[in-house]
């Protein structure tokens, strides 16, 4: 692979990582309401989910999923239902008041990891992203470069998302006082993204 091709992919991957989306919302909300440790759990889950889709794409499994309309739709609808569930849960939480000294149980890193992982695994568009992007940059007959490109994309995410966590941590004291509003906003985003995933054309 040429240096120009690698840099081109890195730029595309960087723009993808920086573009606000579901991962950004998940990480910011978790960092603001549950703290840095839980937010890092979400980041690890997101990264593992992307890794699973990337490996599946390189192995040709994502192509099979995309070729089967029923299988694709089942995964898509499950993902949409999960996002709407997260939105409903956030809306329910908005009924409760929280303070910095609140002793309510906070989800651990493991529980947060599962949320990040499930959110990505139940979104077939992550797999389609890898399936459509990687072949454009991989040299013919050199599949090992696929692993390099995936590592670049995941590495950029592992740099950017923790930066968001640090920024959110600085605003946490203020925004915790606005938890009801924050929950309602993120609930609206989750439900909107769930409906978009459910009804969006392939």
Model-predicted segments: where are they?
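Juxtamembrane transmembrane-helix termini in multi-pass membrane transport proteins
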Residues: 2-73, 132-152, 161
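Short alpha-helical transmembrane interface motifs in multi-pass membrane proteins
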Residues: 7-12, 81-84, 114-117, 152-153, ...
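Select subsegments of transmembrane alpha-helices in polytopic membrane proteins
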Residues: 45-52, 113-126, 183-186
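Hydrophobic alpha-helical transmembrane segments in multi-pass integral membrane proteins
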Residues: 56-58, 122-130, 190-202
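Selective transmembrane alpha-helices of multi-pass membrane proteins
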Residues: 67-96, 157-164, 174-202
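Flexible cytoplasmic inter-helical loops of multi-pass small-molecule transporters
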Residues: 92-108
